Amino acid sequence: MRKNKVKQMMAEGKPVVNGWLQIPSTVSAEVMAHQGWDSLTVDMQHGLVDYTNALPMLQTISSTDVTPLARVNWNEPGQIMKILDAGCYGIICPMVSNKEEAERFVQACMYPPRGYRSFGPVRGLIYGGADYADHANDEILKLAMVETKESLDKLDEIMSTDGVDGIYIGPADLSLAIGEKPGFDRPEDTKAYSEILRILEHAKKNNIFAGIHNGTPEYAQKMIDKGFNFVTIGADQRAMSAGAKAIVEKMKGSISKKESETY
């Protein structure tokens, strides 16, 4: 089976730089896949992507060396199995609050006897290889999102669940769960920032990977320096918006300067 580059990198102590796809387009997925990301996550929760969009996006990503991942919209076994069968090499699962939910998530990702995933990886066999069934349980990356109030009280039971490779922090939902305003790149004087560091320490103690969503490269680097293995920066639509805005503002400023010089 094709090796999971993301798992290999993190096991070797190398941080993974992950991109985020919210636009349901193979064109934007292709553009992103050629920018040097280690992995790209198709966002099926808050993005505009459904399964019919996700499949061709995964195919597009798979034409490069970038590892294809997906965030599902809920801890629902049928959806998890279906996107894995489509050739996804890792799942980020939202709103995992306790051990029971963690077990439900990881077991949907694994074939018996470790899980209850049904066998039928139509595209997984094409992308992963003929021996997919022999190695998929270990190669598929399984990241549980800890972002609810309950999960903050049950970190160790979630992180010690057999099959959980790591956790992923969504700072916006985490902030809301503890009564603060949502957003990325939490300031150091917020409770959310303290919780992020506490979650990271529990991940280290349980010897699992830790990932987090960031708003800027500078904050992502700060999180890597703290010990995070996996960092996401923004999303495709944010990158497009920021790039376009910078171009327009520079051009408008140049035009205004020229006009003022004529008077």
Q: Where do the PLM segments sit?
A:
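Expand to "…catalyze enediolate/carbanion chemistry for C-C bond making/breaking, isomerization
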Residues: M1-Y263
